[in-house]
Amino acid sequence: LAGFARAGQDGARATAGYYSKAGREEKGIVKASFFTGVIGGVLWYVLIYYWAAIDFSSEQIGLMGGIGSAVSVITYLFGGYLADAIGRKKLFLVGLGCTIAGLLLFLTEKNLAVFTVGYALTSLGGSLEWPSLTTLLVAKTKPADMKFLYGVQGFVNQIGLTIATFLGFVGPPIMEDLLGPETLTGFKLVFLATTICAFVPIIYVLGVKETERKPSSLRAHFNKRTRRILFMYSFQNALIGFGAALVIPWLPVIFNRSLGASDMWVGMIITLSNAVIAVGWFVVPKFAEFRGSVTLIAVCQIASVAPLILLPYSPALIVVAVLYTVRSFLMLVPQPVLNAYVMNITVEEIRASFLSLSQLAWQAAFAGSYVIAGYLWANDYTKPEPFYYAGALYVAASLIFFAYFRRIKESHELAPAIT
């Protein structure tokens, strides 16, 4: 325990020290990540809560979420290729434009078709933004330091997400009490503020210089070994995506409808979880040096299943808050280490393509599972079974990840580097 505590302190110092020495462009990308975190917080947590508040059924919510997510599946087929071919910065800006267009549609009156198109646009935007921004960071640091850059980027992104989710849940009822408008009007103001925030990353990303690369055949870099790595990573990613859609997007509604949490409580539970994740992302990179990135990721993901399964049996909201926070911490905190690991086992020329194709597997499974989940819940958010299904898929994916990738070394651990 003392060793882990020291590693946590060392991790925080190392991450902060790295950022203090970072250049203007790295800091610009990190600052842009704050605002993409705001967008992500509203779309991931607040949106489905809003849909439930305006009386969409679970089947309709599943349909909107599934169709919207399916659109991003199509985008992931060519998004990574475009990022590698025409530039990550240009594609990020295109994705941001799609996200803004989708957010504007949520300002309209309740309409299943319009909201489905809106969610499709935001999903499309996210599928272009994420691999582009992630790979923009890679060229700004050495492989061995990458986890620290992703750590601070994840920390800042999570701070934006935390603020957005808290205000997204708590803001509308407070505005109703203080100013008089309906709560639903408050939700629309949340979407309006999010739309404004979506313009800010443009300022930071335009200032980033992207190294021009000579055109080359991407297929030449996808050799047999790389294709095998891509398949295994995508397969376990799909299992996690399928499990996630069964439960995770529905949790705010479950907290409210099944466990009796008010809007304020829902906001506090999710805010606490996100704040802890933010701190974790700042300190966790150093922990990878204990047993390696793969072991850290697999152990944390498997450990997250127990608190997830216990959630529907919670006797009090404070227990819900603790279990949800522990689950989120264990499942999500290793993400910067995972991002750095994936970047370090692929070559520069195909990194965006690799990320897009592997995320395609996650998103395709997530989209199909989202629709299934709507019928599985059937407007009864007291069921424990979806938690068991999700937990089983998480464990299976984590075991597959560990069994295969514990043999795959990162580029800075090899001499010569992976080619």
Regions found by a protein language model. Give the residues of each.
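Helix-loop boundary and gating motifs at the non-cytosolic
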Residues: 11-70, 229-270
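Central cavity-lining transmembrane alpha-helices of secondary-active solute carriers
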Residues: 63-81, 271-283
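Helix-to-loop junctions at the C-terminal end of transmembrane segments
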Residues: 75-87, 280-292, 377-378
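Structural signature of the two symmetry-related core transmembrane helices
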Residues: 90-105, 295-310, 388
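Cytoplasmic helix-loop-helix junction between adjacent transmembrane helices
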Residues: 120-157
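Glycine-rich segments within core transmembrane alpha-helices of 12-TM secondary carriers
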Residues: 151-172, 361-370
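A membrane-interface helix-boundary motif in multi-pass transporters
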Residues: 173-195, 375-394
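C-terminal membrane-cytosol helix-exit motif in multi-pass small-molecule transporters
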Residues: 195-214, 400-405
